[in-house]
Structure formats: C-alpha cells, structure tokens
Regions:
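Glycine-rich phosphate/pyrophosphate-binding beta-alpha loops
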Residues: 22, 98, 153, 219-233
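Conserved metal-phosphate-binding beta-hairpin within the catalytic cores
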Residues: 128, 139, 192-224
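Active-site nucleotide/adenylate-binding loops and adjacent lid/helix of ATP-dependent enzymes
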Residues: 7-10, 51-133
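ATP-binding N-terminal substructure of ATP-dependent carboxylate-amine bond-forming enzymes
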Residues: 1-47, 51-53, 57, 64, ...
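Phosphate-binding site of ATP-dependent enzymes
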Residues: 105-186, 207-214
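Short beta-strands and strand-loop turn motifs
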Residues: 18, 40-45, 71, 92-93, ...
Length: 233
C-alpha cells in the first residue's frame, strides 16, 4: 500500500503532519502503520479515526451515548430498502468531503443517488433529510472552539461548495443564541469523547427550525486549506 521509502522517510521525522483525506488517510490505516513503526504523528489514533470515518460505525457508537443524529439505515450493494421517506440524504458510508452525497426527493432521484453513492463503495447510508442550518464546531484538546455557520450560496455544502472560494458564506462566531451555541459545543465535545478522538477534530451539525440539534459526523483530519473551516475558528 505504501512505498517503503516513504515510510523510511517518515521514520526520520520528529513528527509527521497528517494532511491526508479519504480512505487510507482518515480511516486509521496510516495511523496504525505509524503506531507499529513507532512514528509520531499529528491527530487522533487509529481506532478513533476508524470509528469516525465509518458513518455506520459512528452511529453505533454515538447514538447510545444520547448524541442526537438523523435517523438512518445502512444499505449494502444489491440490497433493497422497502420504505424511503422523502426527502432523504444518500451518502457513501466511509466517504469524505461530501463526495457522492445526494439529496433525493422522489424514487427516481433516490435510484440515481444510490448509483452515485455505490460508485464509490459498496455500503451507503440513507438518512432522513433535516431541513435546517448548517454549522461546524472544531474541538481542540477536548475543548470546543466557537461555532461557525456555513451558508452555501447554492445547494448544500457539497464538494464544490467546500473547496471553491466564494461559493459559501461562513460566519464565525455564528449568529445564534448563546444557549444554542453552548449546546452545539457540548455535543461536539461529547462526540469526540464518545469516539475517543483526541488532539483536534471538527464536528458537523444541523439546527432545524425548532432549534433541534443534529450531529452529522466527526472529521478527524479536517481541511486546512484557505477555504477550510478550522483556520477561521
């Protein structure tokens, strides 16, 4: 999976900065390899990385801890789902950067969304669509940073809106009541505690029209580009 010379080079470093995304980078494989070789690295360990990367596994860990998350089911390639409440969100189980994520409003869009998600992996997550505002909360050494609101100018916070400069309005601190912000920070910290995430991470959340908070996922290697969220917090 990795060229030997890359690992040899990493062994010589005092600390390896983890700037990887997607499979092998965020799912704990690199972290586990580094642990076996005694290589120090930034970010959380292999187990919490694996839990956070898998949306299916994360739900199994976070929901029993009382953390509010959208209802959803896991669907494997070739299997059918009997009932789908529209609109719904379809996403690859272990994807990142919103790649392969779609919102389906009817059966036709749902089938198209499944085809798109299954083109990336064999397991997808089908979740209820929460109509609300999007937020993100960074957690540094167990302590939540200020809440940031994400307002895409078009559509939802997909891959294009995440990485194309000027496509999304981001407000930090978010223009929300202090008690709501405190709740979001609490749930972000709770997510990281439950999944065993240390050092730093970013938790994505939604706020519906009734001020109900929903936690979406934990990003253990959040983006650090000019358009990324954590540098703004």
């Amino acid at each position: 999976m990795y060229k030997r010379q890359v690992l040899e080079l990493c062994k010589e470093a005092d600390m390896v900065f983890m700037g990887l995304h997607g499979s092998n980078g965020e799912d704990g494989k690199v972290q586990a390899t580094f642990d076996l070789l005694g290589i120090r690295y930034t970010g959380t360990d292999y187990l919490s990385s694996a839990i956070s990367m898998s949306k299916e596994l994360a739900k199994k860990v976070l929901v029993p801890e009382g953390i509010p998350m959208p209802k959803g089911v896991t669907l494997h390639k070739g299997h059918k789902i009997e009932y789908v409440p529209f609109p719904c969100v379809v996403k690859p189980c272990c994807g990142g950067s919103s790649v392969g994520v779609s919102i389906a409003h009817n059966e036709k869009e749902f089938e198209e969304a499944l085809d798109e998600a299954f083109s990336y992996e064999d397991t997808v997550l089908v979740e209820e669509f929460v109509d609300g505002r999007e937020f993100s909360v960074a957690v540094l050494d167990g302590k939540a940073l200020p809440v940031i609101e994400i307002e895409p100018l078009e559509g939802f916070y997909d891959y294009k809106n995440k990485y194309k400069a000027g496509s999304t309005k981001e407000t930090c601190p978010a223009n929300i009541p202090e008690d709501i912000a405190s709740q979001m920070q609490f749930w972000a910290e709770k997510c990281c505690q439950a999944a065993g995430v240390t050092t730093y991470a970013r938790v994505d959340e939604l706020l519906d029209k009734n001020n109900n908070i929903f936690c979406l996922e934990i990003n253990t290697l959040p983006g650090m580009t000019d358009t990324s969220l954590i540098p703004q917090e």
